[in-house]
């Protein structure tokens, strides 16, 4: 019996919506990354994108444990000399709450073209509304 290998054109992708209200950031991100990769499916193949689409709502209400709300620091570089910037978790939530979840999930995905394709299937919204009703997403309880 030959080993089954998924083919990109035959992969069936579902849409799921996840409510981040009160969920712990890391625990939410690990499950979302797992589903974006497709590791929850029996036909998972490492070199093929077999994952589903994930919509995350209420990103502004995501929780972190301990003192991370004030102590966790996000860094990025502008590209100019001395252009390192930093922001705490509180500042990030106030400015761009969806970016916090995007950064957490992106770090858990493979680096390279396949990982970027998986990351593009993630849709994050700060509030409770999203514009993907036409895809009829199923509610995913994490």
Curated annotation (Swiss-Prot):
GO MF term set: mRNA binding; structural constituent of ribosome
Keywords noted in UniProt: Ribonucleoprotein, Ribosomal protein
Alphabetical list of Pfam families matching this protein: Ribosomal_L13
GO biological process per UniProt: negative regulation of translation; translation
PROSITE patterns linked: RIBOSOMAL_L13
Gene Ontology CC: cytosolic large ribosomal subunit
Matching InterPro entries: Ribosomal_uL13, Ribosomal_uL13_bac-type, Ribosomal_uL13_CS, Ribosomal_uL13_sf
Function: This protein is one of the early assembly proteins of the 50S ribosomal subunit, although it is not seen to bind rRNA by itself. It is important during the early stages of 50S assembly.
Oligomeric form and interacting partners: Part of the 50S ribosomal subunit.
Family per record: Belongs to the universal ribosomal protein uL13 family.
PANTHER family registered for this protein in UniProt: LARGE RIBOSOMAL SUBUNIT PROTEIN UL13M, RIBOSOMAL PROTEIN L13
Protein name: Large ribosomal subunit protein uL13
């Amino acid at each position: 019996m030959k080993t089954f290998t998924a083919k990109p054109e035959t992969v069936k992708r579902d849409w799921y919506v996840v409510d981040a209200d009160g969920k712990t950031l890391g625990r939410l991100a690990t499950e979302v990354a797992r589903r974006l990769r497709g590791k929850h499916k029996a036909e998972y193949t490492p070199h093929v994108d077999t994952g589903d689409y994930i919509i995350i709502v209420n990103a502004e209400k995501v929780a972190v444990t301990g003192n991370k709300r004030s102590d966790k620091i996000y860094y990025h570089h502008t590209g100019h000399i001395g252009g390192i910037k930093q922001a705490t978790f509180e500042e990030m939530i106030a400015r761009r709450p969806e970016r916090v979840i995007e950064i957490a999930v992106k770090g858990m995905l493979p680096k390279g073209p396949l990982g970027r394709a998986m990351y593009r299937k993630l849709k994050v919204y700060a509030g409770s509304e999203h514009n993907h009703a036409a895809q009829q997403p199923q509610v995913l309880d994490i």
